[in-house]
């Protein structure tokens, strides 16, 4: 069956004839939604146009072109021993220190109780003995 399939690859001129037929000496446009513009030469795909067997649909096949290994460049990786920039561990440590400092700078329990007009006991953490043994089930 695959051998019986016919591939209709057409030239640009034939496609333009189908898109813009001439009727009574005037140019007549068949489809208003479709446009075709040639791709630049350095674009990473090859374009093939075809027409379906009923002649009503133009099909565009554009697979990406494989780039040979000789044309690629390696990603530059700095030497971690002699690199003066921050290492990953240093960045994580500074972020952790920032979070700890941020928690210490927050308002104290007395300030919170004054701001929200509550007692100071509301802002202390509850122990395990006050944990709800029958929490509501998630829906």
From Swiss-Prot:
Transit peptide: 1-32
Organism: Pongo abelii
Protein name: Large ribosomal subunit protein mL42
Broad class of where this protein is predominantly found: mitochondrion
Gene Ontology CC terms, in alphabetical order: mitochondrial large ribosomal subunit
Coiled coil spans: none
Alphabetic keyword roster: Mitochondrion, Ribonucleoprotein, Ribosomal protein, Transit peptide
Taxonomy, superkingdom: Eukaryota
Compartments (UniProt record): Mitochondrion
Family recorded in the similarity comment: Belongs to the mitochondrion-specific ribosomal protein mL42 family.
Record keyword Ribosomal protein present: yes
Membrane-spanning ranges: none
UniProt keyword Secreted, yes or no: no
Assembly and oligomerization: Component of the mitochondrial ribosome large subunit (39S) which comprises a 16S rRNA and about 50 distinct proteins. Component of the mitochondrial ribosome small subunit (28S) which comprises a 12S rRNA and about 30 distinct proteins.
């Amino acid at each position: 069956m695959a051998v019986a399939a016919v591939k209709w690859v057409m030239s640009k001129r034939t496609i333009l004839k189908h898109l813009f037929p001439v009727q009574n000496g005037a140019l007549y446009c068949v489809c208003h939604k479709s446009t075709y513009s040639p791709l630049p030469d350095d674009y990473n795909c090859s374009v093939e146009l075809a027409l379906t067997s009923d002649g009503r649909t133009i099909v565009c096949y554009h697979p990406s072109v494989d780039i040979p290994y000789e044309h690629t460049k390696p990603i530059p990786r700095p030497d971690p021993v002699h690199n003066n920039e921050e290492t990953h561990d240093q960045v994580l440590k500074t972020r952790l220190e920032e979070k700890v400092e941020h928690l210490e700078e927050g308002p104290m329990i007395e300030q919170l109780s004054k701001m929200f007009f509550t007692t100071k006991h509301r802002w202390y953490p509850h122990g395990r003995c006050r944990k709800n043994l029958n929490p509501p089930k998630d829906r």
